[in-house]
Amino acid sequence: MGFIQVFLLTTCLSKVYVVHCVEVDDIIADAIQDTYLKPQRDFGVGNDTIPETGNSFAFLQKQKNDEDTIARAGFKYLSFIKNLIQRSGKSFGDLESSDEYQRSFRTQLCDTITPSCKKYKYSSYRSADGLCNNLRNPTWGVALQAHARYLHPVYDDGYNSPRQRGRNGGVLPSPREISNKVLAGGVTTPPDDKRNLMLFTFGQFVDHDLTFTPIVVGRNGNTLDCCGVDASDPECYAIEIPTNDVRFPGRTCMDFSRSIPTPTDEGCSIGPRQQVNRLSSFIDAGMLYGDSKRFNENLNGRVGTLRTSSGDILPPGGICHTSQAEDFCQLAGDERSNEFPSLGGLHVVFLRLHNMIAKEIRQVTGLSSQDVFLETKKIMGAIMQQVAYGEYLPAILGKDTRKKFCLNLRRNGYWNKYNPNVNPTVKNVIATAALRYGHSQIPPELGYMTRMFAISRVFKSEDVFMDPNIVVTQQGQNIPDLARFLLGTPARKVDRQIENAARNELFPDVNGVTFDLMSFNIQRGRDHGLPAYNEWRKLCKLPVATTFSELQDHNSDTIARLQDVYDHVDDIDVFAGGISETPRADAVVGPLFECLLGWQFKELRFGDRYWYETKGIEGFSRGQLREIRKMTFSKILCETLNLDEIQKEVFNLVGSKNPRVKCSSLPFMDLSEWKKSFFPFVDWSRFFTSG
């Protein structure tokens, strides 16, 4: 008997545990053997282009070849948990709460090596994937790690099977039925009389800086056909379409694949299925650059700039469907840049801003191309934080919420409240529910608006999903007109009434088969084991309803619709309950999502060692910080799109309190402050760790 086993046995006997630890060791060892003897799920090499009959939305989300290792480890972990339950005769809950089993599990299976952060301690630049942002907990916020959680997941079997049962034991209603009955119908909500479509667009842009959850592929490496040949695959979780569905008559099934699994605690403890975030959990403009060294290098152009194509727009190489022969898919740091034209246009805006800054940094400092790229990338991350917290969050969260979660920026000086004990990792409920509030703002149409602010052309949203034509046509000459349309068109209010384009006409394939984004959101929450709506209200210290009539932040019509589809108030899915709340007067989202988003954005600030207001090598000099604070989203649009006029409050509609002003009257940062900085020679390549 080895030293560790003797130690464990002594510990067990001294505490008079019912099960001796040696027996526990044997049970776990047998479960390990069972796991490795059984064949594991395998993945082939999938297509790099969308199959002719495939769906671009699912193709975008499918796991990449370099994520196969993570998925394999996740499936092996789940297989082990299943075998351990069978071998031990215990429930998953008992195993998870057992000190003996957890201790033996760590001893026999945990081989995680904590990365060394010595070379990052004095680095001015964050790593591409977020590694060692936190020197004590190097993997917090890192790309390709599990989403963290505020609440323990609720799986039907405790650890893996999606949440499908309600409080009374009955099967939860189909997400499509919820979508039909709760998220549609009734009196149409009028457009927002204060905010514009640019708010929706920037919200999507920020979301793509923070979260991207890949889905499982089949054994051939391609997306699963869960309504066809792959229907029996355990990773299929197809959505049932009601027989009386008006939009999908004759269809009974909507394709849906589960998110790839990853172990709890990096495989060092017995726990439930977790989901992977492909991106780093920091506001660092990662959607421009990617979250790996490989992506950074692929997009890097000459003298520290990003690669472009004719018209100073993104280079070709992304994923999309093109409607015109001369069009091309745009390539950006995030694969979803072609998802919606307004998003694609914003990618062009920030691409141009990077290149403008890089060229001037090169001129005033004489730095090498690599150093110019790194310094410009750092500045762009700071600008993203400045706009996100200085303009975007004040537009969606109420004043009290921003104060409660310390989200207001300083006007001068440094902010020195970085806390290494704060885990910034994006939480599962944020990625899967709260940040999806913007799906309620998807407009029925996009368009162009001339310099005289007259609409010149309109496009139905369902016709432009995954089609970059509006952006790339005529080498991007119409992007300013698209921006004016976004600035001058009222936003949709965040409520239960979802646009037809998002609920019925999402991402049609070549056969005209479409999807329902709301059904996807509800099903994804169940796939991830998100607890029901009331549990999140409790977490946020909001009133919790015991009956439908006690729902406090829903109007009577919404309450009636929720009661019509759910058996019990405790069954309400968090997305359905959160998106249908009535926002407070100064907020865009309802109280629950306001709480969750405020909490997460606080962690993203307090838990980021490279937060731009920070003093030290991770931040900027006082002069540089002063210049960054001059930057506003309105001036960014002016400079990159050659606009003449714009409203100062860029996410609000033009009005007497928010008139258009000359772009020339808005300040821009003075990059001569960077000439005063001293850049010692450093081998910067060592700060890129991801392949």
Regions found by a protein language model. Give the residues of each.
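Cleavable N-terminal signal peptides of Sec/SRP-targeted secreted and luminal proteins
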Residues: 2-21
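N-terminal accessory/cap region of cofactor-dependent oxidoreductases and related radical enzymes
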Residues: 18-356, 360, 375-378, 382-519, ...
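Mobile, glycine-rich extracellular loop/lid and propeptide segments
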Residues: 369-372
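Residue-level "edge-of-site" marker
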Residues: 537, 550
